[in-house]
Amino acid sequence: MLACSVEVALLFLANKWQMLILRDLLAGSRRSSDLKRAVGKISQKVLTANLRLMEMHGLLARMVFAEMPLRVEYTLTDLGRTLEPVLQQLAAWGEHYRELSCHKTESAIEYADDNS
């Protein structure tokens, strides 16, 4: 049962773009253009596809405001917000790994300097 549950979770968690979109929506509602800037090197086509997929899975809601010009914002649903602790744990692990990697790199440089 656990393996099946892990596979289900990884269908979402293994997608880099969706995790970055989630990260940015945890701070509040965002327009597509704001998300594109925040996420970084993502095409509009890929961003739109991921937003639609996340909406289809109930992780975010698309809100259309009847203004001129038309304004569309995305916000996390309650289900989407349940991923916040998961993202926090991933961030903590990433920070820990980054620190370990820096120490390993520094040690390798010192070793190379000592043995040259």
Kindly label every feature range from the protein language model.
Residues 54:
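DNA major-groove recognition helices of helix-turn-helix
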Residues 2-46, 66-73, 104:
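N-terminal helix-turn-helix DNA-binding core of bacterial DNA-binding proteins
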